[in-house]
Amino acid sequence: MEKSAMYLRRAAIGYLLAGSGFLLFGFPFWFLHAVDKMPAGRFILPFFFVLDDPLAAFQASWMQVLTSLGLLVGAVSFWQAGEPIGPKRTLLIVPMAGALSYLLAVWILLPFAPMGAFLNGLGMILVGYASIKAAIWTDWKRYTPLIAGLFPFVFMFPLRFLTGARPAAVIGLWGFAWILLGIASWLRSREIKAVQLA
């Protein structure tokens, strides 16, 4: 039980970091009228867009690296805690792959950036559905993985298909769903601590 609470706190920190990273990504688009531009790079194959200068890309995308690591830490910590889905924790492989895909997108933008959003969304939909069925988390907390997973499919992907451009401002809003998941994980760790003390 103590280990589970520790892993849930770690997941909370990871998802809070990821959510903050998404919000920081969106900030310039919301308030500074930033324009989303494609970085300098070239297509190696028809669907692999590699950035010209990986070091400059890494320096410019440090927040994306932290966000990706936060998503990875959150998913791995859920795996270790066995929550919120109990024995079906193999479903967490999908959001782990999404986090790794986002990490690779720092250098190889296509196909890894959209694949990261898709895998994180799909993975959290699967985890969210399993969380609702497992009923390990109580109240509103059990729905938070599903909210994080549905966000790109309800908001980001439709806008991408309608406008033909990456919806950078909306991608930033995804941070609120990840922060909500981090808060739910933190509160669940406190519930476990309270049960231990009783």
Language-model region placement:
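Hydrophobic, aromatic-enriched alpha-helical segments typical of multi-pass transmembrane helices
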Residues: 2-198
